[in-house]
Every structure is written in C-alpha cells, then in structure tokens.
C-alpha cells in the first residue's frame, strides 16, 4: 500500500468522513487483484502518516459508526474499548459519554447485559512497573484448545500495551519464540524482565532472554521471573477480555457441531479442518481486539499507545543480535543437551505434501467464505457460517485427495 496509495487521496477520503473499511473498498477497486489494501493496512498507513478525522462527528454519523462497530466486534465492547475501536477506524476525539449513549441506542440489550456484569473485582496484590520496557508478560490461552487454537500474547506491564499476539494450533517453544518474543525484540527492543508461568513452552524464549540480558536497560534486575499463572496480573486481565470478545463466541458455535455429531474430534482430518478454520477466524477477532485495546483510554494516563511513546525505555537491539529461530534452537540444544519439539499441526493435514492442492484448498476457502463475516456473525450469536466453513473445509480436503 505504501508504494501504490496516494497520500493526498487518502487524506481527502478521511476529510470526507470515509472510514478505513470504506477506503479499503475504494483502493481495492482502484487496484484490482493487488493485495495489501485491507482495512488494517489502511489503519496502519493512516497512523504512520498522521492522517485522521479532524472535522466534528455528528451524532448521526457516530451512531452509524457505532452500529457498524457492534456488528464487527460484538456485544462486549463498552464505551472505552468501543472508543478505542472507533479510533482504529479513524474517528478520534469522541467523548466516552457520547460513545456510551450511542452504544445504548445501537443495541439496548447488549447495553443491559454489560451493565449487569460490570461489577469490578479489586486486585488485592499491588502491581508496579516503572516504565515501558520494565516488565514484559507473556502467557498462553487455551480456551479453544480442544479445537486446535492457542493464543499467546505479550503485554508491557507499565503501559498495558499489547505488543504482540500469535495464534497457533498447539503451544510450542519454537513458534512462541518465532512469532512472539523475536518480533517483540526486533520491533521494540529488550525488556528488563520477562515474566511467564512455569510452563515448559517458554524455555527457548527464556534462554534467549538470558543470553541477551547484558543489553537491557537495567541489568541489575533478574532477567526473567516464573510465577503461578494467576499472579501474572496484566496478561490475566487481557485473557478475560479475549475470552468474552473472541474465544467464547467461537467455542459456542463449534460446540454445537460436536453436540450434533457433525464434527468428530477423534478423527485426525476433522481435527485439522476445525483447527484451520477456527484459527483464521479467531485471528480476525484478535486483530480487532488488539487494535482497540491499544487505543482505549486509561483514566488520567492516555491510551496504551500514547503511554508507550512517553515512557519507552525498552533497550534497542540490532537485528543481527537477535538469533533467528534456527540459530536459537541450535544454541539452546547445544547448551542444555535437550531437544525442542518442532512446530506441528492439530490433527492431520493429508494435503501437506502437495503444495498445489494446499494452495487450491486455500483459494477455494477464500472464494467461498469471508473470515471477517464469519467472525462478525459468530460474535453476534450466529455461528452458522463458521460451522459451514468447518464442514466445507473437511469435505474440500477429502475431495482433493
């Protein structure tokens, strides 16, 4: 998008009040067959070029955008996270009270449900982080584990900014290092302290964190701490949000397939199909949640993205100093004498040895199903499209054998 989009055109679209979704449609029409014009790409482009709405948003315009937001992210976003979501769509500077009123008008039943469950639970154990770059919390979420979906997230303890998430079939040392820790180190730098639970899936990440520990901002701190998962406070807060906004709606739809005997989780090909579709669907929800979370206002402090820019003390590290996955695995196994399990799928992909058939399956799935539509419907209580996609994936795989 950076090479093809005209910045003046994008600014003009925003000035006319077009959302990122609308701009994505326009650019896709201008450059048919060219990838890279998704709504998320447009969001990133606008953020990098400081392009956002500067004209007042009328109540009617706000109402329409909130209704679209509810359709996209479901019933659990309150005024703060919905304000964050609207910011990801280019709508800045809208008061929480206005967003709250629009939410109440857009979906009264959702508003009542949020109010009924809004009692806040106090955390009896004080939490402290000195700056962005002090504590990095990494944890896994397996609420969809029975369907071959595991989320891993990394959050900065000071700002609350989600700096990286990854979705994988099964938790795995190599995938967590490759898709979570290494991208964080390359993008932001090193944290003084990495905090994880006692799971063995973090061994490679801890090994590299320790090997790079001399390059941290504050080398007097322990480079990592392992504790009970329930005491990994910032990341545990995030999982509650993710479960409500992503995992539970997807799980509810898939549970129906199992209950109706339409999905056999003892059969390896079916396990692979449900994992493939559920992972891609949940990635849509995770992307929407992460963007909204990082733009939601924290009273008296600003958004996580803003706090990051004000107190960033993560230690920059040159890319060549961060080992590749292959280098990290070799170093770990040489130093410990252990062996790390390579990445693997949930269930059996019978087309794995045929790239042409794998590509054909992917193209057929994209042609027949839109992942954003699947997620939006599932999160609003209609899981039929997700169920159809799982069954279609299984039958399509069988037909390509």
List each language-model region with its residue ranges:
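Double-stranded DNA-binding cores of transcription factors and transposases
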Residues: 1-36
